[in-house]
Amino acid sequence: MVYAAPVWKVYLRANVESRGAEIRDVIVPEFYGHVKRLINHPEASWILDDIYRGVASSQQKAILLREWYGPEFAIFKTADPSKATAELSSILKESPEKRKPIMEHLKHLINQLIQKKMTGFTMLHDAMLQYFLNTTPGTEEASSFLEIITPTPASNKEQKEEADNEPEIDLLKNLAFTSSGSRVVCLALTYSSAKERKQIIRAYKDTIEALAFDPNGHRVLLTAYDVFDDTRQLSTSIFNELIGKDASEAQQQKVLELASHGTGRLAILYPFAGTAKWLLPDTELVRIEEVHKIRETTSKKEPETRRLELVKSLSSACLDTIASQAESLLQSSFGCQFISEVLLGSEGDKSQALASVAEAAAGDPKEEGHVAQSPFGGRMIKTLVLGGRFDPKTKKVTLVQPPLDFHNIFYGRVKDHVVDWACTASSLVVVNMLEAEGFSHKDDLLKQLKKGKKSLSQAASEAGADANGKKQKKKAPGNVGAKMLLEKL
């Protein structure tokens, strides 16, 4: 097979994309039997990996990856290609006697590419994951693999400068941005010693922000949060780069960008919300559960203690951001979730942040764009008014300590429009104020509602959405919150 020039990568990709599966099934098999030769070539390797990553079907990927396990997988074709598997555990289970030659061949090929600094290939990352998953923790095999990817500690400035050019640094940075590669890094962090974890995270200096916004890279940060016992060191390595060390407008802007980004928010909300399903999809939860199970024997600190220490490190920056950027945060569901989690879970003085949220919710709630008009805004205000999260097991609200007292702050800003609030889709906010523990304006609120009884009756009798602003399959007659308030009157 003749090695293709770089232009052929574009040509092959364009051909497959324009002509579909038919041409794909002609082109991809041409690479079978040549993987080891191609992956070691400076130009052909990129073509092979591009085809593997972006063109080949799952079965074709399996056939190509199998060639990393030894010459026999390249020479002898699978009788039924549709049943070919690249899962090394399945292959070793079927032929346990082949374990030693397969693992040696795989490790040798992995080492070759790392030493050549050809570490950006998805195929390499998939192969490394298969190798790591089939080692036994604590064995020489597993330890030597960790040594391959863990940078050597540097004791002085000159050594540190040299260390920045180590192949392990280049490898770790590339691994973090693919699915299999990020899992390799996460497992390495989880199984490593405290000293090795520090070296691994140090490799991502000047890359932390990119990790936070990446669909694969952020997992490295979440794993570090879960396994580091030295949270002060972790805060220095990650948070100082992610959001800045000192309070400033630049820091607040960084926090705002993270909080408003679908992936970026995980890096800043995970210490507050943990494994909440609204924050993490099922695929993320599976990876996190894997880490949590392993850390039981590899980390010393209690998980809740670790989490609270991370929350303490983030609290000041997050509260400052809410205090200065409340209006911007209230414009999106992500921003509202950020406000709720931080105000309920952070440490420190929350008064300015609470006042800013209440001020941003002031004004006529009937106006377009007002927080009362959005389901996510209404839910956030309702949660803060209650002063805690609703526990479905006890059917009660678990209040935060010390109390937020948001209901009293909020009422001071919306008193003149409280009847209008009671007639909007966010009417349950007013219901919750009446029911909230420690609300000192109950009599005044009831007085205001009695004055607006006519408006409440009209809202309660009109057909429309429910009190949370959600469309119902069958339209309910009237505003649920307004009805509840009329009953209380």
What are these regions (language model features)?
Residues 1-489:
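Eukaryotic gene-expression regulator signature that favors modular helical reader/repeat domains
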